[in-house]
Regions:
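Catalytic histidine neighborhood in serine/cysteine hydrolases
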Residues: 155-171
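Serine-hydrolase catalytic machinery in alpha/beta-hydrolase-like enzymes
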Residues: 1-79
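Acidic catalytic loop of the alpha/beta-hydrolase fold
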Residues: 140-144, 170-171
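Catalytic histidine-centered segment of alpha/beta-hydrolase-like enzymes
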Residues: 168-180
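Short beta-strand/loop motif that positions the catalytic acidic residue
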Residues: 129, 134-137, 141
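Alpha/beta-hydrolase fold active-site loops
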Residues: 8-11, 132, 160
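Short alpha-helix in the alpha/beta-hydrolase fold that links the catalytic acid
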Residues: 145-153
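Primarily recognizes the serine-hydrolase "nucleophile elbow" in alpha/beta-hydrolase
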Residues: 66-131
Length: 191
């Protein structure tokens, strides 16, 4: 919790795919959490159902979207949260689960997708999204060709921002600081 009385912007961070080792303790999630907490954000990171000590089991995005809805409701009730300054930050499958919910929920003002898995989920809803959005991909990401990422981003309506970090792959080892810098600057500018 930031010091002071607020209200403070808030971000809900959604982790990568549960079936491939994704959890709220992922390197990207932890780096974002550490950096944004120093920027006076109220933050929530959580494990999707069936991960860590969470109840339930993976349900191919359906239950995970319910988890995101619950996280938004929980965060919106935390004292000190600026209700018009909330964002969803999703990494990989976390973007696939979190961004559609954030798009539909009027409490969410901004969306961030890190390594959005276009082959796993349909991100076409973003073509109708007028909320500020940031998309980041690694130039060496084996799951998302840079050409496809750029083609998709070019078709999105404003406001938008997108970046390819040339030497980074899908897992961002050693590039966490670059991600956190881009995400922090974006959220500070739109929230």
């Amino acid at each position: 919790m930031p010091e002071g009385s607020g209200p403070f912007p808030a971000a809900i961070i959604c982790h990568p795919h549960p079936l491939f080792g994704g959890s709220m303790d992922n390197n990207v999630v932890n780096s974002l959490f550490a950096t944004l907490s120093q920027e006076s954000f109220i933050l929530l990171k959580f494990n999707f159902r069936g991960v860590g000590g969470s109840e339930g089991e993976f349900s191919h995005g359906i239950g995970e979207q319910e988890d995101v809805r619950a996280a938004i409701s929980f965060t919106s009730e935390v004292a000190g949260v600026a209700l018009k300054k909330m964002a969803i930050v999703g990494y990989s499958a976390g973007a696939a689960f979190g961004l559609p919910v954030g798009f539909e929920d009027n409490r969410i003002k901004a969306l961030v997708a890190i390594s959005p898995p276009f082959d796993m989920s349909d991100f076409e809803f973003l073509r109708n999204c007028l909320k500020p959005k940031l998309l980041i991909s690694g130039g060496e990401d084996d799951f998302i060709p840079s050409s496809r990422f750029l083609e998709f981003c070019h078709m999105l309506p404003e406001p938008k921002e997108y970046h390819i970090i040339e030497a980074a792959d899908h897992f961002w080892g050693g590039y966490e600081d670059i991600i956190t810098t881009k995400v922090t600057a974006f959220l500070n500018s739109v929230l």
